[in-house]
A protein has these predicted regions:
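Predominant activation on well-ordered alpha-helical scaffold segments within soluble catalytic domains
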Residues: 107-111, 182, 205
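Glycine-rich beta-alpha loop segments
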Residues: 6-15, 19-149
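Glycine/threonine-rich flexible loop motifs
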Residues: 65, 198-205
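Residue-level signal for short, function-critical loop segments
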Residues: 58, 193-194
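Phosphate/pyrophosphate-binding betaalpha-module
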Residues: 124-125, 129-191, 202
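A generic short-segment signal for beta-strand/edge and adjacent turn/coil regions
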Residues: 18-25, 117, 157-160, 186-193
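Amphipathic alpha-helical interface surfaces
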Residues: 105, 177, 197-200
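C-terminal amphipathic helix plus adjacent low-complexity
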Residues: 1-4
């Protein structure tokens, strides 16, 4: 075998550059440690020491958008009154419209955190849409530090646009994500949400 052939063998890749190696089950502890350390390095770099954490639904939208979804569902159902899927779509849209005021509540709460605490606290969320977006938006609007700890889900969840540069993080392990949510926290605020929000709430309570 030539030297060139040897240099192209998979075993010759440096371990820390070998993605195939890092994805093996046996390397899970290393991956978990990386998920602990990467955000930690960035948070220290930005001098983040204390946080206020906001939990809440990813599905709740601003009232204007929520009303638009109800209207669209009503119009679709009017064309096919017997369609069960469209009936359920309208039911869901109406339910989310009732929760829409919490979007503004989360945004204003984060406004107040930054207005009164300045640089002392950063606002932290799960980094996704809905009420997480609202809280990040509130901090962002007041030029505060706005952090998002997102998670890989079966359905893709994009980060919201109101997270401070270099403070959006994507996790694979829920446990490590929760660790970072708790580590620097001084207070938690829980807005309406689903199973994910309840899971986070009871994790904190216990």
């Amino acid at each position: 075998m030539s030297v060139k052939d040897i240099e192209h063998e998979h075993s010759y890749i440096k371990a820390y550059e070998d993605i195939q190696l890092l994805k093996q089950d046996v390397m899970r502890p290393v991956r978990m440690e990386l998920e602990v350390m990467k955000p930690e390095i960035y948070l220290q770099r930005h001098h983040i020491e204390e946080t206020i954490v906001c939990f809440g639904s990813a599905r709740v939208r601003e009232e204007k958008e929520a009303k638009g979804k109800v209207k669209a569902a009503q119009e679709a159902l009017a064309k096919n009154p017997g369609d069960k899927n469209l009936q359920h779509r309208l039911y869901e849209a109406e339910g989310l419209l009732k929760l829409a005021p919490y979007y503004e509540a989360a945004r204003k709460f984060a406004n107040l955190v930054i207005e009164h605490a300045g640089d002392r606290f950063a606002v932290v969320t799960g980094g996704g849409p809905g009420l997480m977006e609202a809280a990040n938006r509130g901090a962002f609007e007041k030029n505060g530090k706005s952090i998002g700890f997102n998670i890989t889900l079966p359905h893709e969840q994009h980060p919201n646009q109101y997270i401070t540069k270099d403070l959006a993080f994507l996790f694979h392990y829920f446990a490590i994500r929760k660790l970072h949510l708790v580590m620097r926290s001084k207070a938690f605020v829980v807005f309406p949400g689903g199973f994910g929000t309840f899971d986070e709430l009871f994790e904190i309570l216990t």
